[in-house]
Amino acid sequence: MSAIFPELPDSVSSEFVTVTEGVELRVLRAGSGDPVLFIPGWNYSAEVFVHQLTELAQHYEVLAVDPRGHGKSSKPLTGNNYPQRGSDLAALIEALGLKNLTLAGWSLGVLDALSYLRDHGHDRVAKLMLIDETPKMAADPGNPEEWGEVPLTHDGMPAFILFLSTDRDGFLSYISADALGVDPELADQDEATRRLIADGAQTPEHIAIIAGVEGFATDVSQTAIDFERSGKPVLFFAKEAWADDAKRWVSANLPSAQFATMPVHAGFMTEPAAFNARVREFIG
C-alpha cells in the first residue's frame, strides 16, 4: 500500500450525478461544512485527492469529481472538450446545491474550473484555487511576460503533440512519474507511480489525446484575471521547479492572489500535510 496514493477510506462516499443526457459524473464526498470541490488533471480520477478527502474533510465538506472521460464517469465519444466540461461542472454544482464554494483545479483541471467560471459565472463560487497550471499552456519562450508549459517553437508544441498522440502510454508514464518527483526511467519501480499510471489509464486514448491537445491550445487567462478583479480570493500553487516564473506571471496578472509553492506537480499527494495546512489557512 502506497502512503502517497493509498486506497480511499470508508469515510469517503461515492455517487453518480447526471449532468447531461447519457453522461454521469462520479463524485467523491466526505466531511461537512463549507464545500471544497477538487478537479483532477489530465486523465486522472478524483481519487488522487485521497489525502484531502480524509484530512481536509475534518474541517469542510470535501468533494472531488471524475470529469467526463475520467475514472468511473461516463466516457462518451463526443463532448470531450473544456467548454463542455465547464458546463458539466455547472450542472453538477447546481444538482448538488453547492454554494459558498471553494473551487480547486489541478493541472489541466484548471482549464475545467476556468471554463466553468467563464461560461457560467461565479455566483456560487466564493474562492478559487489554481494548482500548478497556467491558464494558458502555450507560451513564447522569448517573451518574458508569458509563462506556459508548452513552448511555442518548431520543436516545442509539435513534440508535445506527437509524443501524446503516438505514445499515449509513454506520455502517461512520463507525466505520472514527473508529477510525483520520480525519475521517469524508474516509473515501473515506484508503487505510487504505478498506481497513478493505472488511475490515468482509465481514460480512453481518444479522450486523452483530445483533452491534451485542446489543453495546449486553450487560453482562459482572462477568466482568471476577471475572477481576481472581482475581489474574491485566489490561491495559486506552483511547483518549486518553475515557481519563479509562475510567481512573476501571478504578480503581473493576479496581483491580489495568494501564492504558495509545493515540491512537485502533485505536491498535494507527496506532501499532503503542508498542502492541506495552506489550504486551511486560505479558506479559513
Enumerate the predicted regions with their spans:
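Conserved HGGG/HGGXW glycine-rich cap/lid loop of the alpha/beta-hydrolase fold
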Residues: P6, V19-T78
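Conserved acidic catalytic loop of the alpha/beta-hydrolase fold
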Residues: P83-L101
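Short beta-strand immediately N-terminal to the catalytic nucleophile in serine-hydrolase-like folds
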Residues: L103-G105, I131
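Gly/Ala-rich beta-loop-alpha elbow adjacent to hydrolase catalytic centers
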Residues: G105-G109, A113
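Conserved alpha/beta-hydrolase catalytic His-Asp/Glu region
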Residues: A139-W147, I161-F227
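Conserved serine/cysteine hydrolase catalytic core
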Residues: A201-N253, Q258-M262
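Catalytic active-site module of serine/aspartate enzymes centered on a nucleophile-bearing elbow/loop
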Residues: L254-G284
